[in-house]
Amino acid sequence: MVIVKKVILNNVKTHSKREFDFEKGINLILGPNGSGKTTLVESIFLALFGGDFARVIDYFKKGEKTMAITLILEDKGKTYRIRRKWVLENNAKLVESSLELIDTIPKKLASDHNKLLQQIKHLFGLDKKIIPLIYYKQNEITKIIEMDPRKRKEWFDEILGIKDLEEFSEKLKMAIKLIKTGKISRIEDRIKLLKAELNKKSLLENKLKNYKEKLVLLSNELENLEKEYKILENQYKEYLELKAKLKSIEGQINNINVKEIESKINNIREELNNIEELTDYEKDILSKKHEIIRCNEIKNRLKELEKEIKDYDKIKKEFLEIESKYKQYEEKRLEYEKAKMLEKEKEKAKREYSYLLKEKESLEKEIAELQNKINQIKELEKMEQELLEIQERIGVIKAKLKLLENIKDRCPLCGAKLSSDTIEHLQKEREKLQKEYYYLKEKYNQLLIKIRALEKYKGLEKVLEAKTKHLETIENRLKEIKPIIELEIPKIELDESIPYKYKQLLNKVSYLEAKIKEYERYKNIECPYDIAIEELKRIEDKYNKYIKKPALERELNLLLKELERYNSLLKEKEEILSKLNPEIETKYKELTKKKENLLSEISKVKGIIKEIESQIKEIEKHESTIKQLEEKKRKWEKLVEKLNRIVKALGRDGIPKALREGAINYINDMANIYLREFTDKYKLKVNNDLSIYAIPIDNPHYEIEAKNLSGGEKVVFSLSIALAIISWLSLQNMFMVLDEPTANLDNERTLALRKTFDKLEKMVEQAIIVTHNELLDTGENHVVRL
């Protein structure tokens, strides 16, 4: 149901900057020759299809470098804007191509030429192919009737898409050829090569068998060698261990000086005999020594404590001062906590106040809107009354229309014969009543929609009352909160260093008081340090000799153990020498070399076996590949078979013929339906060869070739066929453009054509007629004057 609403031209031929409005129904573009009428309608198609419609450079206004066309379309209640802009360089360059939905919020649907063409096809069903059906240039309105049947068939096939099917069929034939010579041929060559490779498999299998037998022999030989080697390996390990142990023992024996050890043992024993007599002094010396150590510890601790407690008085004084400040701090802190709580309450109140203000503002708006809707309900009664009046008037019109419906030549009431003027008058009256009926019907529907929309507002008084009460509650709460917000809270500053200093000094004082107590305790301990020193000096010489006894005993034990170890090593050396067999080493080295050679040979054979197996596997893969390739070949052959069937179906006696005949049958039926709206003199017949004939209603056996009809009749036939084709293409309610349809017609035929156009209004949503002939203006059509 697409119609043109507005065309805006900038520098298009004779039009510098102009806007043209169009309406639903018949639109006349009236003006003398050369006024730019044809340019205006061609601009519609230039906006839709750009350079695909015509050579853009020919439309630039002389001397201008830019040109723009804006087209406003309406379809299914939605409004669209198409804009194209060109600049003149060496040629006309398209710099803007856009499509927007401009109902409420603008939405861009396309921003380049190709996307725009796609959207025009998708949204409105328009493409370049249907231009000949909806746009008739000067002297072309009867071209469907007048063109040669062969050309008509070509034109008809292009519109139906049969030409596209033929092109598609040729492309399929080319694809079939490429598949046969390319894909299938390459697959066959590949299969041939792979089958040649398969013949090598048996030779490789025999070779593999020989090498596997050789590997078994070598493995058996290695197994026997391994058993012998394992026994000898353990013997050889024992041999090496004994050899290493012997070397270690000999080294240790050489490091021991036996004579020197024996001399030292004798000297130490003699010295120990001399020390035995000093044993009685041991307990006394130890007692005095412990007494001296204890006294030294007490003296040292007293010195440490004196250092620590010397600043006690000063710290105690500082503590008393800070204690007073701490008490003041605690009092102030309680006030601070109280102020902080008040501040939190105030902030909470502020947030609540702000929220309530917003809610109040929102409620006030809602109440105002509700009040407005309630006021609208009062208009409902007036609308309902108006609806009843319209219903009554529609009933009256329906009755009159029913009465006038079957008027031919006699009065439906009295049966009297009517004059032609009376019949014409009654027909005009009927048309007038029909227009009034459609107008009232539309008004009735609009009122009904408004009434239904307003009915939902009933019962809003209770909602308004509830909202008003809620508003009062909010206002009362705002009054309660306001004093809290306005409350002045005193600012209190706390010195946070005071509690820290207080705790620090308290810990110091407590620590020092504990140390003073410890100092007093140590001071009262008796310590006979000087007496113990005097007695220790008296027995010191004897003591110094005595204290050497443990060291001498330890040294003696070590020397005795070393002598014992020497004797043990000599014995162990003799045992090892009796076990050593030098032949084991020679035999072990020979066997190791033999094993290495055998392992190398086995590894080499395994490598060859692996390589042969890999080659066999690769060849076996060829079998799978051949199957896959053969399956692939079958698929391509099936595809070729299917494509050949499609090509056959697309041949002359296939789909194109069925499509053409189906379309011709449909067009015959629909064209006659449209033709009956224009005239009751003829029926229309379109043959399969697309020859067109007129059959007189009063003589159905007589056929007239349509091109031999009068000018006005040819126009009617052309329009009927065009409308039928549009219907076949599912493009009903499309707009139509006729350029100078009355050219070469006299006044009588022009007036007859005007009646045809009046009937055309029922068949298309919009018709735009370009003319210089004022006779086409009935006074009821929308006129654009140039």
Swiss-Prot record:
Domain of life from the UniProt record: Archaea
UniProt keyword annotations, A-Z: ATP-binding, Coiled coil, DNA damage, DNA repair, Hydrolase, Metal-binding, Nucleotide-binding, Zinc
GO biological process assignments: double-strand break repair
Binding-site positions, ATP: 13, 33-39, 138
Free-text comment on the cofactor: Binds 1 zinc ion per homodimer.
Domain called Zinc-hook: residue spans: 366-459
Cofactor requirement: Zn(2+)
Coiled-coil regions listed: 194-249, 337-455, 551-650
Pfam families given in the database record: AAA_23 (PF13476)
Entry binding sites for Zn(2+): 411, 414
Molecular function in Gene Ontology: ATP binding; ATP hydrolysis activity; metal ion binding
Family: Belongs to the SMC family. RAD50 subfamily.
Domain notes: The two conserved Cys that bind zinc constitute the zinc-hook, which separates the large intramolecular coiled coil regions. The 2 Cys residues coordinate one molecule of zinc with the help of the 2 Cys residues of the zinc-hook of another Rad50 molecule, thereby forming a V-shaped homodimer.
Function noted in UniProt: Part of the Rad50/Mre11 complex, which is involved in the early steps of DNA double-strand break (DSB) repair. The complex may facilitate opening of the processed DNA ends to aid in the recruitment of HerA and NurA. Rad50 controls the balance between DNA end bridging and DNA resection via ATP-dependent structural rearrangements of the Rad50/Mre11 complex.
Listed PANTHER family: ABC TRANSPORTER ABCH.3 (PTHR32114:SF2)
Oligomeric form and interacting partners: Homodimer. Forms a heterotetramer composed of two Mre11 subunits and two Rad50 subunits.
Name used for this protein in its record: DNA double-strand break repair Rad50 ATPase
Organism of this sequence: Nanoarchaeum equitans (strain Kin4-M)
Gene coding for it: rad50
